[in-house]
Amino acid sequence: MCEVTVVIPNYNGQKYLLPCLRALYESSNVEMHVIVVDNGSEDQSITDAKELFPQVNYILLDRNYGFCRAVNVGIRTADTEYVLLLNNDTEVCVGFVEKLLRRIKRNPLIFSVEAKMLQYGNHELIDSAGTYYNALGWAFARGKDASVRKYNRQCRTFAACAGAAIYRKAVFEEIGYFDEKHFAYLEDIDIGYRARIYGYINLYEPKAQVVHVGSAASGSRYNEFKTRYSVRNNIYLIYKNMPVWQIVLNLPFLMIGFFIKALFFWKKGLGSVYLKSLKDGFAICDAGNKVIYDRSRLKNYLRIQAELWINVARRLS
């Protein structure tokens, strides 16, 4: 019986999709369904993939709707208990799917499990060993640029990087799917935050490893596209998931965090993009879907708040 569906979003990924699929099939000994959701690519990535991997279910969208719409289509199409999201610019290591599947099955409260991501240019360096968010309004990857020999213990994380993580499908029906107003960036923090509010947990599994190119769709680590959506979505994420009392409590930290980021992006030549994106973030809050505050979940909010403060120290250490 198949328990897991792998969903791979694709947009003009001719350089990456074939190696991604090849590594997935060569490194896995578990029965799985694979869905590639294409965001209206203009290259030959899907044509090439269909020729070499006809067993894959290809869903072709008419244009680029963004990461969130693509993975939502894939998740809804899946008929398995678990869904594994995988970026097209990744190459999984041996046993990747099995190790994530084994971990998430251990506890029904586990919503997601993130893999250990290694840098494509140097497999000896970590790309991400857990996804975190803090009271400064900063999302960050734990262990970035550290040796692959570090961060070898399984642990809880704030959220799971959706580029290489397995999810319990039934929970999406309870907390909602990826918010398509995000288009791309911070959507994984948002859904991980929501899961935490509802009392679920997110884990990091170091035994499951994947090589990640990073920024394959946007072109570089810091660019106008990535800055625009990540900054805009951060405002929306805060508004959506934090009740008023939590926003007020974190406001001094958030103001400091936004100011530091403004200086950072100004030095990168993206200062005006950053400021405009802040305004855009406030604009989409009105049309957004704020999580309804439920006092019965106060303990969950307090746990989240404690972690937001702890993660400031984690980020600055």
What are these regions, as identified by a protein language model?
Residues R22-E31:
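Short, acidic, metal-binding catalytic loop of nucleotide-sugar glycosyltransferases
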Residues L125-I126, W138-F140, A146-Y167, A184, ...:
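A recurrent flexible, glycine/aromatic-enriched loop bordering the glycosyltransferase active site
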